[in-house]
Structure formats: structure tokens, C-alpha cells
A protein has these predicted regions:
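Accessible peptide chain termini
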Residues: 1-3, 396
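Leucine-rich solenoid repeat scaffolds
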Residues: 373-378, 382-395
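Thr-biased low-complexity repeat/linker tracts and other Thr-enriched repetitive architectures
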Residues: 3-380
Length: 396
């Protein structure tokens, strides 16, 4: 589904057998490389450079595929091959750090900018190599150049610390976020009563620029007309997608209060996570059915929604609650407890898949499986327990 899709498809047809048989890639890896702008060139570059990158530079085929699976994958691979020795030998980076920088969109430009600016950022501005790498891996070329330009000003004139500037820059859109902080921090502090730390917290996420501008625009209305506090507005804005979450609160808070009897505190709790907008919209849509048809309380629905991935968790509860209760013997409270963590959807789906095997084949009780699932990282914990019981590791 790209302008160069014809060339990519023809190249997959031509190179897939060789990449799989001679180079050990899977068909899925070949497709991943091809499914970006410039997929044809990326596949040809993988075929050309994979042996050398693995043999001479110690990369794994998986790392080569990860670097190639972006727009501009060809350029990223060629630049990494060219700069890896210099960045490691002359600039003190680890091979993994170079690979990580290359494995993001704009990897070529980010690597070239690290080579150019790392000495100055470390020697003249006091940043560490790890900080430069963090900026390059997220904000890329533009963020590194913005840090070079604005670091002294933001620290000297605005009172920020170097760590705060790095935190703002180390996100997608870091350049724009730094410029927004330079422009809006005095206004947000003087006119709206925010602290520097609050402004930094809002800016230190993907989309920080938009979130800061939206806070400036909506803070008076959200506080005066909707009864929120400044701290609540900041909490909503201080996540990926903060702009969208604030606008969703502005739009849905009156409806959720009037039609669904939610409190402002509950609405804020739902909105104050990555994906807050989607979670609020899903609560509005699914709360009546979850309460009337599935017997949940509004408080339980809010608890499920008030995590990263709340939208997906609510939709999965709607789909799996009847099955998990009727066929697997879980109580509603147990399903809610499992769903009420970040990644609730994945945990519920993994529980549905592994619960019968863990109980019947490995002798765990229902309560033991539920206890494993009812924490952050529940999906990974269930899969690790299953793997260990299926093929015991003597070291454990």
C-alpha cells in the first residue's frame, strides 16, 4: 500500500527465496522489510549487506531486519555500516546503541547528527553519551539540533535542568516540544499558575508541543466551567496523546456526569493515561451494556478504563467476560482485577488461552492462575510460567 508497491511486490517475488534459503530470514521478516516506502531498495540492501553486517559487525539477522523495516531502511543500513566503527571507536558508543539509533525512523539522519554533534554536546554542554543516544533514538536529528541550540537558554534563562531538557527532547517531536517550552513556559507559569516542573511533565511525551498549546487554550475553561483543578488538567496532559485527551474531557465530561453519573475525579482518572481519549469514548459507548448486560458497576468500568490501553481492555471485557465466567469459572471480580492493569486486553486473552492447560496439565488452581495474571506484566508472567512448566529449566 505504497506508491512503490509494484516494485516492492516484484522484488519480494524475486528475492524472497534467496533471503529465506540463503540468509535464514522468514517470509514474515521479508514482508516487514518490504512493507515500507522504499521497500524494494531496502530488500536489495538487506540481501547485499546482511552477511557483512552479521559477520563483520556482530549484528543478528533480527537486528538487520528491524533497522530495514522503516521508511528509508536502505539508507539506515548503509549509514550504520559506514559509521558503526567510527561511532564505537572514536565516540565511545556501544554497538547496541548505534543499532538502536539506526532502528528508528530517520535512522540515517540521526546517526550522522550523532557523529557531528556528540563531541560538542558532551564536551561543551555536559551531556552524557547515554543522554545523546536517548535523544537520537526518539527525537532524532531535529531534537539533537534543538538541544544544541536551546539547552543553555532553557537552563540559564528558564531555570530548567539538563535532565529536564533531555527528557523533553527524548520523545517523538522533541524539537517542537523544546521550542514550545521556550515559547510558552513563561506564559503558563505567570498567567496560568503552573510550575516549571508541571510544564516539563506535559512536554516530556510524544506530542508535547500540541499538549502544551492545548493546556494554554483549555485550562481556563476546564477549571472555571468544568470544575477541574490545574493539577488535574496537568495530569491529563502529561501523557502521550495529551492534546486529544484534554479535548475529549472538554467534550465528554458533561455527558459522562449527566448521563452516566461519573464524577469529575473518575473522568480525570480515565483520561490521565496514554490513550485517554479513546478510553473516555469507549466508556461512553460501553458503560451501559457492561452494567446492564454484564452486571458490572460503574466503578468497576472506571477501574478497567483507568490504565494504559483502557479502550482495548474494556472491549475485551465485553467480549470475554461471559466466556471466562461461564466456561472457566472466574468471578466478575476476578475478571475486573485482571483487566485493571496496563495491557489488560493481552492478559485476558492470554488467560483464556493458557488457563485450561495450566490447570489440567500442570496442576495449578484457578486462583493461582488468576493471582499471576492480576498484576502488571500478567501476560508475560503467564507465558513464562507456562514455558517453565512445559519445559523445565534446570537452572530454576
Amino acid at each position: 500500500s505504497h506508491g512503490s508497491s509494484k516494485q516492492a511486490l516484484e522484488t519480494v517475488q524475486r528475492l524472497l527465496p534467496g533471503l529465506c534459503n540463503d540468509h535464514g530470514l522468514t517470509p514474515a521478516q521479508v514482508v516487514a522489510v518490504a512493507s515500507n516506502k522504499g521497500g524494494k531498495q531496502a530488500l536489495e540492501t538487506v540481501r547485499q549487506l546482511l552477511p557483512r553486517l552479521c559477520h563483520d559487525h556482530g549484528l543478528t539477522p533480527e537486528r538487520v531486519v528491524a533497522i530495514a523495516s522503516h521508511d528509508g531502511g536502505k539508507q539506515a543500513l548503509e549509514t550504520m555500516q559506514r559509521l558503526l566503527p567510527e561511532l564505537c571507536n572514536d565516540h565511545g558508543l556501544m554497538p547496541d546503541q548505534v543499532m538502536t539509533i539506526a532502528g528508528n525512523k530517520g535512522g540515517k539522519q540521526a546517526l550522522e547528527t550523532v557523529r557531528r554533534l556528540l563531541p560538542q554536546l558532551c564536551h561543551d554542554h555536559g551531556l552524557t553519551t547515554d543522554q545523546v543516544v536517548a535523544i537520537a533514538c526518539n527525537g532524532g536529528k531535529q531534537a539533537l539540533e534543538a538541544v544544541q541550540r536551546l539547552l543553555r537558554l532553557l537552563c540559564k534563562d528558564y531555570g530548567l535542568t539538563q535532565n529536564q531538557v533531555v527528557a523533553i527532547a527524548s520523545n517523538s517531536g522533541g524539537k517542537q516540544a523544546l521550542e514550545a517550552v521556550q515559547r510558552l513556559l513563561p506564559l503558563l507559569c505567570k498567567d496560568h499558575g503552573l510550575t516549571r516542573n508541571q510544564v516539563v511533565a506535559i512536554a516530556s511525551n510524544s506530542g508535547g508541543n500540541q499538549a502544551l498549546k492545548t493546556v494554554k487554550e483549555l485550562l481556563p475553561e476546564l477549571c472555571k466551567e468544568h470544575g477541574l483543578t490545574s493539577n488535574q488538567v496537568v495530569a491529563i496532559a502529561s501523557n502521550n496523546g495529551g492534546k486529544q485527551a484534554l479535548r475529549a474531557v472538554q467534550r465528554l465530561l458533561p455527558i459522562l456526569r449527566k448521563e452516566h453519573d461519573l464524577t469529575p475525579e473518575q473522568v480525570v482518572a480515565i483520561a490521565s493515561n496514554s490513550g485517554g481519549r479513546q478510553a473516555l469514548e469507549t466508556v461512553q459507548r460501553l458503560l451501559p451494556g457492561l452494567c446492564n448486560d454484564h452486571g458490572l458497576t460503574p466503578g468497576q468500568v472506571v477501574t478497567i478504563a483507568s490504565n494504559n490501553g483502557g479502550k482495548q481492555a474494556l472491549e475485551t471485557v465485553q467480549r470475554l467476560l461471559p466466556v471466562l465466567c461461564a466456561d472457566y469459572g472466574l468471578s466478575q471480580e476476578q475478571v475486573v482485577a485482571i483487566a485493571s492493569n496496563s495491557g489488560g486486553r493481552q492478559v485476558l486473552e492470554t488467560l483464556q488461552r493458557l488457563l485450561p492447560v495450566l490447570c489440567k496439565d500442570h496442576g495449578l488452581t484457578l486462583d493461582q492462575v488468576v493471582a499471576i495474571a492480576s498484576n502488571g506484566g500478567g501476560r508475560q508472567a503467564l507465558e513464562r510460567v507456562f514455558a517453565q512448566l512445559s519445559r523445565p529449566d534446570p537452572a530454576l
